[in-house]
Amino acid sequence: MVEVTRPPTKAWATLSPWLPSRGPDADYWWRLTGQHLSNMVEAAGYSTDQQYVALLFHYHWIVPYMGPAPGPDGNLKWKSLLGVEGSPIEYSWKWNTAAGKPDVRYTTEAIGSFTGTLLDPLNQQATLEMLHRIADFVPTVDLTWTNHFFATLYDHDRSKYAKEAAAGAHFTTTVVVAAEWLKNGLNLKTYFVPRRLGQSDGKLPIALWEESLKQLDPNSESRAAMHEFLNNDPEGKLLSPFMLAVDNVVPEKSRLKFYFQSPHTSFASVRQVMTMGGRIPVPESQLQELRSLIAAVTGLDSDFPEDSEVPCISEYNPAAKDNFVEIDLLLSGYLYYFDIAPGATVPDIKFYTPVRRYGPDDGALAKGIADWMTSRGRGEYSQRYLDMLADLTEHRKLEDGKGMQTYVSCLFKKSHLDVTSYIGPEAFDPARFLKHKAHTTRSTRRRSDSH
């Protein structure tokens, strides 16, 4: 059972009593993640109707696929890559512009009865079922490209995957789904982490990615520009692909997002990737804004050398070692995605800094980005963000650790920087179970004292 230490939002308090139990597992996830989501959409200024829609969608379509609740000791059936400790969900808060409001999104890995077994070694059946049920219910959802990548980025002989598992191969997350609650409604995305037979280091050769991509759009000018950068630029050659995302809309409107990891964290390397070696014109003022954002969330001095690597803690969560064994590149360096849009000549590029490893504790990090927003006329929701984070971390104080905030990303727009904070619920953090155990013990003692 999840212990709640703060009053719920009005939307949660109104809806929850009328939603029937779905069993102990789903009830656990609804109480934890449903309240997290309700806090986020309220803090982001969503209308009451929008809050109800987001919560009801989560209850009916996401929570039933979140898998077993953790045991009393925090053990779990399947560890997702979405959280370093195995949480199957990650939230995001896209910061407001000076005249707008934040957007709330979350990404989740569906977990089913056969997850991790010989029947479903890559854990894809629950996601497929969830997506097709949603597509039957939401008319704007189109799974054409999603079905293509399920067919082309994986092998389909389960017996051979079973042999690899018996020989000691480590299988983990291969597909996740994002629900993005924009002011005009729901957007769904599917993210693919390929795992082919014989692939044990988390890296699928770029040629195999391209085999799948060119079947959809053999003459993409934007993708060709990306490959030119990857093949010829010194920084581009260091980028390792690890994930692909698609919008679940009709193919002519869908975009491809190709995710890469770079071992470099110097701002000189960031500049080179974000401009694609000078191919993409980015004003120097925007580059310096990004540099100041990185400094704000990682605790760097404003004059930190542009060609120096950002210092990081050696090991921020021991649980990550075992979970990321085949894709440990995600535990270091910077991340980027290349957005391949229909008809574009060059990709849009988004930058991610993994603040769960770089920078100060969660309290200082949150204050750093809130102050950065305020100093640029975008601070209307800064205090709401800080209060919302405190609501999500009922098991500890923000300043007592790091890892609740996982990434900060930036995408250049014409007039501003699109900035997003990514938040992990720490659903399997030992502190949650210790706190609940103490709470349960106190409650038991009070009951026994009354007899």
UniProtKB/Swiss-Prot annotation:
Q: Which UniProt keywords apply?
A: Transferase
Picking any one GO molecular function of the record gives: prenyltransferase activity
Question: Key word Transmembrane present in the record?
Answer: no
Under the heading CDD domains, the entry gives: PT-DMATS_CymD
InterPro entries registered for this protein in UniProt? Aro_prenylTrfase, Aro_prenylTrfase_DMATS, DMATS-type_fun
Pfam families, alphabetized = Trp_DMAT
Specify the pathway.
Secondary metabolite biosynthesis
Which residues are the signal sequence here? none
Q: What is its EC number?
A: 2.5.1.-
A single GO BP annotation from the record?
Answer: alkaloid metabolic process
Q: Kindly list the positions annotated as binding dimethylallyl diphosphate.
A: R105, K189, Y191, K257, Y259, Y422
If researchers knock out this gene, what phenotype do they report? Abolishes the production of (2R)-annullatin F, (2S,9S)-annullatin D, (2R)-annullatin G and (2S,9S)-annullatin H, and leads to the accumulation of (8S)-annullatin E.
Family statement: Belongs to the tryptophan dimethylallyltransferase family.
What is the annotated role of this protein in its UniProt record? Cytochrome P450 monooxygenase; part of the gene cluster that mediates the biosynthesis of annullatin D, an alkylated aromatic polyketide with a fused dihydrobenzofuran lactone ring system that exhibits potent agonistic activities toward the cannabinoid receptors. Within the pathway, anuH uses dimethylallyl diphosphate (DMAPP) to prenylate (8S)-annullatin E to produce (8S)-annullatin J. Geranyl and farnesyl diphosphate are not consumed by anuH for prenylation.
What this protein is called in its record is Prenyltransferase anuH
The scientific name of the source species is Penicillium roqueforti (strain FM164)
Tell me the gene name: anuH
